[in-house]
Amino acid sequence: MTRLTQSDTWQALSTHTQSLPHMRDLFEGDAQRFKTMSTSACGLFLDYSKNRATEETLSLLFKLAEDAQLQSKIAGMFNGEIINTTEKRAVLHTALRASPEQEILLDGVNIVQEVQETQQKMAEFVNAITSGQWKGYTGKRITDVVSIGIGGSFLGPKIVSQALRPYWTGELNCHFVANVDATSICEKLKTLDAETTLFIMSSKSFGTQETLTNTLSAKDWFLKQGGSQLDVAKHFVAVTSNVPKATEFGIDAENIFPMWDWVGGRYSLWSAIGLPIALLIGMDNFKALLQGAHEMDKHFLEAPLTENMPVIMGLFSLLYGNFHGAQSHVVLTYDHYLRGLPAYFQQLDMESNGKSVTLDGTDVDFSTGPVIWGGEGTNGQHAYHQLIHQGTALIPADFIMPLQSHNPLGEHHIQLASNCFGQTQALMQGRNYDEALNELSGSKLSADEQALIAKHKVMPGNKPSNTILMDKLTPSTLGSLIALYEHRTFVQGAIWDINSFDQWGVELGKSLGNDVLERLSADSDATSLDSSSNGLINMFRQGKI
């Protein structure tokens, strides 16, 4: 057993959670439950009253956090301690949204100053593009930007740009390419004009297979459309730490933006990786996004555990995974602009906490990262919500909704809100057999038929959920929301004593993929791998089944 599962607090939680009342009874017994189990921070409101928890539950969860020295670990991250121990790196994405006057030293260098210099360079670049000062090789202004990346350098900018659509300045269109499947980039290029298109290549090494392949294809297309090698500098910029490789490609050194080892890909949208966001919404709005995240950083660092929004959310997620057998967690966004967030949070959480050993290499004896999934309301109500309501698996849910819409059309938003709040109530309350039977009374069904149908209409309820509200979706509130989930992920990893900042599973996939690529391109059939891999490789080489 690990130290965590042997602890008195863990054992007490294990016993305590076996005898919790139904949430319906908890609400009936406490008229103040909503008031006492909700909190506000950084433009966000969190209602966590619809969780399987009493005062004792919360007390034990906070004790578990204290036992894990959570506050000390939080401070360690912000102070630049080497908490990514397997790669010997600090974890300082929070420095990307720090106040300009802050000083965060890493190896004797104030990295906040480096960040500010990069942001100034971004601002000048954004102004040059959006003002029309930057011209393409035929003298035309840029109208389209293609962002080429993979993982965090793709998903973060894409989802945030999508979420902040109401704040686009209108000067540019932006397109995102990640998948190495040629269809992805080919379909994009069909709609573009080389004379007015700018490509942003985002890769720390300037060698990530998918990103480099797509960038080389983009360059080939550009040259075939009439551009020359000398013109590449007017149509390609890079976010990378490998300046020599980028300049060899043809990118002007002045148009290369830095990346740092202390920022992981899934935390990088706040850096120059966010250049597509800044181009679409303007630098002032980009800084508002950073400011919202910074406010959540301050809250996470300074608020007591009992009032700390990321801590509360992280503890509840841990509670369901470790003590109630939950294997997944659903994120439901009741705002069309936020429809991409479940995919973003999926990468954030599952890449961070999909681990099976503690920091000292001990095999864990508890569940770690759950499957994160979800979608937008109300679409999901006519699909997978059925599983959440009546399926056998416990699936905790987060509901996210702005109180005000950017598109206040007729009764749309009030209907959206009624569905959101109604779903949280239905999940908590459920419907027992007597209630279901009573609903059928007076129908044309026989007594036996009513008794049977009533069983099918029973919903157990007691399904936990959080509800996160904001006045309106803005760059600032979006920044706070994303930082909230970043820190929620950290909380769980810190208590589990795992490394939330490496991704060796991803690295293994890259390595084996490169090995298979060589075999696919070889002159002879594959014979040295397992029979399945050999068979698949050779079938691909033949081009038919």
From Swiss-Prot:
Listed GO MF terms: carbohydrate derivative binding; glucose-6-phosphate isomerase activity; monosaccharide binding
A single Gene Ontology CC term: cytosol
Reaction equation(s) it catalyzes: alpha-D-glucose 6-phosphate = beta-D-fructose 6-phosphate
Catalytic EC class: isomerase
Main location per the UniProt record: cytoplasm
EC number from the UniProt entry: 5.3.1.9
One example of a Gene Ontology biological process annotation: glucose 6-phosphate metabolic process
Record-linked PROSITE patterns: P_GLUCOSE_ISOMERASE_1 (PS00765), P_GLUCOSE_ISOMERASE_2 (PS00174), P_GLUCOSE_ISOMERASE_3 (PS51463)
Keywords: Cytoplasm, Gluconeogenesis, Glycolysis, Isomerase
Recorded metabolic or biological pathway in which this protein acts: Carbohydrate biosynthesis; gluconeogenesis; Carbohydrate degradation; glycolysis; D-glyceraldehyde 3-phosphate and glycerone phosphate from D-glucose: step 2/4
Family statement drawn from the similarity comment of this UniProt entry: Belongs to the GPI family.
HAMAP family referenced in this protein's UniProt entry, alphabetically: G6P_isomerase
Protein function: Catalyzes the reversible isomerization of glucose-6-phosphate to fructose-6-phosphate.
Name by which UniProt lists this protein: Glucose-6-phosphate isomerase
UniProt source species: Shewanella woodyi (strain ATCC 51908 / MS32)
Taxonomic lineage from the root: Bacteria, Pseudomonadati, Pseudomonadota, Gammaproteobacteria, Alteromonadales
